[in-house]
């Protein structure tokens, strides 16, 4: 019974404190998962000859190939943030801990969709002026399009999206692992990863509604941005009331001693 208090405390830590912080990230991953669809559709309307070329009969850089920029940005940004920016903030005495990193990352992912939404009407207008059929836009994936916006115009939204991912994804895994008790660390980390699947479920809920409403690409992106912003505020509220595990009162003496021993061996 004495050591059962340790388990009960870890159940409390996970269910009542970590879960409310993690659940709003389903809205974050809803946006991240949806970019592969929305941004590909946008790229179909753009000039795929981003490195030059005027041959109308061949495909240059297709949307799936252009999206590799996400991987390139991740490879660049993660080491910069972890190896230089976070230590720089610490040396300066700036409080940019895990919760604030996750908040910043969440916001940047929402912002990336707002950038895409602002660009969409101009891209569609330029595409329609060429006389091409919007319904067959996928057939023009990667093709040269005189008068269309270059696919490079998507670089800002990809950079902002990847910056958000680099801020919140590795930090979220670390946060849910360290802030959970020893017996719940695997469960807690898995729940963080599960939020990605919850994001896909949200897409399944909202996408048919937007399609039935006949929304344009830009309007749909604004709608997703608004929903993502709602999730962002949910996270901010949950984070504001969150108490770090080290500062939470223990259920009994055994739980307190176990926690002290754990933090004595863990640098965080």
Residue ranges of predicted features:
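Hydrophobic transmembrane alpha-helices of multi-pass solute transporters/permeases
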Residues: 1-268
């Amino acid at each position: 019974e004495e050591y059962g208090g340790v388990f009960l405390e870890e159940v409390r830590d996970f269910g009542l404190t970590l879960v409310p912080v993690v659940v709003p990230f389903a809205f974050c991953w809803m946006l991240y998962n949806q970019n592969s669809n929305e941004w590909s559709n946008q790229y179909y309307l753009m000039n795929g000859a981003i490195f030059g070329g005027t041959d109308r009969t061949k495909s240059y850089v297709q949307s799936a190939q252009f999206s590799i920029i996400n991987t390139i940005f991740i490879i660049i940004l993660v080491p910069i943030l972890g190896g230089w920016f976070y230590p720089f903030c610490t040396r300066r005495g700036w409080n940019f801990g895990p919760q604030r990193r996750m908040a910043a990352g969440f916001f940047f992912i929402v912002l990336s969709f707002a950038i895409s939404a602002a660009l969409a009407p101009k891209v569609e207008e330029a595409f329609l002026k060429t006389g091409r059929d919007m319904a067959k836009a996928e057939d023009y994936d990667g093709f040269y399009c005189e008068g269309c916006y270059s696919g490079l115009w998507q670089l800002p939204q990809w950079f902002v999206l990847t910056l958000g991912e680099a801020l919140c994804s590795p930090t979220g895994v670390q946060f849910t692992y360290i802030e959970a008790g020893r017996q719940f660390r695997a469960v807690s980390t898995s729940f963080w990863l599960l939020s990605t699947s919850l994001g896909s479920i949200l897409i399944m809920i909202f996408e048919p509604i937007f399609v039935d409403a006949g929304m344009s690409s830009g309007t749909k992106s604004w709608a997703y941005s608004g929903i993502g912003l709602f999730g962002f505020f949910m996270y901010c509220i949950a984070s504001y009331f969150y108490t770090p595990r080290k500062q939470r009162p223990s259920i009994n003496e055994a739980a307190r001693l176990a926690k002290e021993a754990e933090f004595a061996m863990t640098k965080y």
